[in-house]
Amino acid sequence: GCSKTHFGDEFDFFFLPCLKLKKYKYVQEWFAEKRKEALEMGLQDFDKKDKKTWYKSQNFETVVAGIPHTFGFGGLHGASDKPIHRKGQILHVDVNNYYPSMLIAWGLVTRAATNNNFKMVYDTRKAMKKKQVAAAKAGRKAEAKQWKKAQLPYKKMLNALSGAMKDETNAAYDPRNNNCMCINGQLMLLDLIEHLEVVPGLELIQSNTDGLIIWIPDTDEAFETVD
């Protein structure tokens, strides 16, 4: 449960200590500049419509790993302007439960929470996922399907919190922690891309809020380096 609280620090977001950006540090610096801008103009006290207009206007475009990218307060998107055709090892690097995992790992669950139910729901779903995978590996398809279906209500509850934290009418409203989640989520994926660029021959095909699609040479060395 949550108890609606006014924190008054929507734009006082911070960067997580795990970030080790070098080549693309300037993207993090752009977010830092936006924080300064918002605080200096007192955006916290603007009405809902004006804040929404400001948020939508904040986009930073740059090229990352040869692919045009757009960063903002809602997420990141990177894709080539032209179709890409590749054969070989195309990997979809999907971050499982990205936002829920980040909220728990870095203490960013809404500060309006009155209990630890979010972590309980997270752990319950994780246990079900483990059973689903085990059943699938053992060839028990019906059981695996059953466990997958059982997870759905928990998955919806977990994913609902990120949106609720930006909804003024919701008791879970905590826009600062939502900003921390969205911004650091983008920067951690950017950090991953920066580290993957050292793999000889690797190509980034697409990136989005919670995952990447990459192409790597069909060699054991390339796969082991990525792994």
Mark where each language-model region is.
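Conserved "right-hand" nucleotidyltransferase catalytic core of DNA-directed polymerases
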Residues: G1-I90, V95-S101, D191-E197, L202-D227
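Helical catalytic core of nucleic-acid polymerases
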Residues: K52-L192, V198-V199, W215
